């Protein structure tokens, strides 16, 4: 029978993974805090080249971490993002909210003529001020968030704009970078992104260090 040579210790795998990322990824343009965040995101997507597409506004990390420490809710566009958040890492027992499956969402989608992912954000209105918004799946959700902010909606403390896909993903993130309405943000330019990267970023923000 064949014998396979591989590392069996979970902690050793974890530590070696991060060491490889730090050795191979170009982190030179990031601050120390941003580099820690970037390493987590690379770990989630498996591509060291992805750092070229990471953009963090100057005050993003500090704003997001301060909000989380103050107990801000985390508003997620997708259940996969919400489920990826490690609750034990949250500094203030922060509520993690996803309204995509709320029974009111389908009717709201029909009313506004948009996707359920976008319509679900209308149910965030009372929780939006000072929150940490995490969009890792639907470009329509990010576009709609920008429309809400344009129209005077309360501002979150930080936005993680990381939807993935071939239709609207790159454009929605470019729109956020062009005008975030004064809200600190993080994006992954282009088609790359997704729930795993977004949740990894949240977990890094929730508890600094690797």
From Swiss-Prot:
Its EC number is 5.4.99.61. Gene3D superfamilies: Cobalamin biosynthesis CobH/CbiC, precorrin-8X methylmutase. Keywords: Cobalamin biosynthesis, Isomerase. InterPro entries: Cbl_synth_CobH/CbiC, CobH/CbiC_sf. Substrate binds at residues 17, 40. GO terms for biological process: cobalamin biosynthetic process. The active site is at 43 (proton donor/acceptor). It comes from the Bacteria. Homodimer. Belongs to the CobH/CbiC family. PANTHER family: COBALT-PRECORRIN-8 METHYLMUTASE. This is Precorrin-8X methylmutase.
């Amino acid at each position: 029978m064949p014998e396979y040579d591989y590392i069996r210790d979970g902690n050793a795998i974890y530590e070696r993974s991060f060491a490889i990322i730090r050795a191979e990824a170009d982190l030179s343009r990031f601050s120390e805090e941003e580099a820690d965040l970037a390493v987590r995101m690379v770990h989630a997507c498996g591509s060291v080249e992805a750092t070229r597409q990471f953009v963090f506004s100057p005050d993003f990390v500090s704003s997001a971490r301060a909000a989380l420490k103050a107990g801000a809710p985390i508003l997620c566009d997708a259940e996969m993002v919400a489920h990826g958040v490690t609750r034990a890492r949250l500094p203030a027992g922060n509520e993690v909210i996803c309204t995509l499956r709320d029974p009111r969402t389908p009717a709201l989608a029909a009313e506004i003529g948009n996707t359920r992912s976008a319509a679900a954000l209308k149910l965030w209105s009372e929780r939006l001020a000072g929150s940490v918004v995490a969009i890792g799946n639907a470009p329509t959700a990010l576009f709609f968030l920008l429309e809400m902010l344009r129209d005077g909606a309360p501002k979150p403390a930080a936005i993680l704009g990381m939807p993935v896909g071939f239709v609207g993903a790159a454009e929605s993130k470019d729109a956020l970078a062009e005008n975030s309405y004064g809200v600190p943000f993080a994006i992954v330019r282009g088609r790359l992104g997704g729930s795993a990267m977004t949740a990894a970023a949240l977990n890094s923000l929730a508890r600094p260090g690797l």
